[in-house]
Amino acid sequence: PSSPHKFCWFNHEPEEYQALLAGHTVTGAAGFGIFSELEFDGGVRLCFNDGVNPRFIRKEEVRPKKYQLLLEFTDGSAIVFTVAMYGSISCHSGDYDNEYYRKSIESISPLTEEFDEGYFKELLASVKPAMSVKAFLATEQRMPGLGNGCLQDILFQAGIHPKRKVSSLSDCEKNVLWAQVKTVLQTMTEQGGRDTEKDLFGNPGGYQTLMSKNTWASGCPACGGEIVKENYLGGAVYYCPSCQKMEEEKR
């Protein structure tokens, strides 16, 4: 790294990555859960989580001065990896023994047919009743790749407050929440990610967020009321107190 980062973790000494990767050819790429992974010949892999920002740099472009890893190719182009808050960049040969890496691979993805209502309700039943809906959705990688950024629109579309206890959800609300997890994540994926994030080439995602740093000052898209922004469980939450009640509406 040109700029050491206190909260960027490597599974080898950073100086060893040169020897581990030099001479290998990129053969593919994969994404699962919170990880993206570059695949090289010889079984070598470079994986990084959602706290790492990779950026493709063309041959004629100037390299940034600060980065945590610079991967240069023989044609003069490169990928620069930077970390804002925290992240991990790991080089391995299929033997990476990391809890979140394993969960990202082994857990059932919300983008698959296997993630049905029955499985979702099993997940709900497996956690403590007093757990909040945000904690259920965004911690422990129960749903690979679903984090704080994605859950904002899921909860808004479901009409559920992020601080609601799991035990307070009715069967109807559980069904709606499952459907919105599936629908919102599928839409985000198809549209190239959220507009609050950038892709490998520096372009923002095509999914227009409803509840995010881009929209919270504009008011609720459903009722026009004020959107609340506050810190909760290690990250900002955005919600409409009118549309997302702390308890189910009685009909």
Segments from the language model and where they lie:
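Acidic, proline/glycine-enriched N-terminal capping motif
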Residues: 1-102, 237, 247-248
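Basic, nucleic-acid-binding surfaces and adjacent catalytic neighborhoods in DNA/RNA-processing proteins
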Residues: 1-17, 30, 35, 121-251
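Flexible, active-site-adjacent loop/turn segments at secondary-structure boundaries
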Residues: 50, 54, 84-87, 103-106, ...
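Noncatalytic, beta-rich nucleic-acid-contacting surfaces in large DNA/RNA-processing enzymes
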Residues: 56, 70, 117-119, 175, ...
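Short histidine-centered catalytic/ligand-binding loop motif
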Residues: 60, 103-113, 164-171
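Short, amphipathic alpha-helical segments
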Residues: 61-65, 114, 127, 144
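Short, mixed-charge, low-aromatic patches
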Residues: 74-81, 92, 105-113, 132-140, ...
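A short, charged helix-loop
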Residues: 87-128
